[in-house]
Amino acid sequence: MYYGDPRKPDLKKEDVKGSSRFKLFFTVLSVRFWQLIQLNLLYAVFWLPSYIWLYIQGLLMQQTNQPVTLEFFILMIPCLMLAGPATAGVTYVIRNWARDDHAWVWSDFKDAFKENWKQSILMMLINGIALLLFSVNVRFYGSIVSEGFFYLLLYYFMFILAIIFVMMNMFVFPMIVTYRLKLRQILRNAFILTMVKLPLTFVVFALAGFLMYLSLVYLLSIPFFLVGLTFPAFIVISYVNWILDKYINIHLDEEKEETEGEETES
């Protein structure tokens, strides 16, 4: 049972049982809308260091007319790591809501935060290092593109590689909070799942990214703190739930049924 707007009746399982993914998405969104705002306010606290550092860097760029410095990316790494466990907590709560399961905003967030903090921090460390490396390579190849077509290809290849890596993150955190796997296994599976449905994954990524960009235009203002994080996350995780059900969970269910059948026979 769901707990949403007190003026609306509670949403029961039979209300969405057998529904299409789209119907389930909009039904759950309408009921969980205010809780998504609550979760967004909680999640935004852990992104404050990143917001502040990004804001400072923006001011420096306006004053000096200089591009983003390497120091910005280096200092961004610990800011990202701080948001890692909170990302796991938010992912767990939204994952449950998106697949028609119940989750409390604070208690389930806290439990997932505590249970997955190690892998989450490590993943954000990897993200920070990857961000630094991509920026260095893009600058390097961008400075020598005039020397040959090969360097131009490498320049655009780095952009493509960066986009694929970001899309992999769409799958990483849902798998961290769902399966007991080592991080290297999660990254491998995330790459495979990204490539399996690459066009559709890119559409979802672009939509979520566009919504986050709209809220970032109003940096440190109401839109970002209310819906700028959890609403795009709800879109992404709803899609990821479908992919995981289609390619992973269905096989886990089959193995579970076979195991239960063997135990019954014995």
Feature locations, PLM:
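Membrane-helix boundary elements
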Residues: 130-166
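Helix-coil boundary and N-terminal low-complexity module in membrane systems
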Residues: 1-139, 151, 170, 175-205, ...
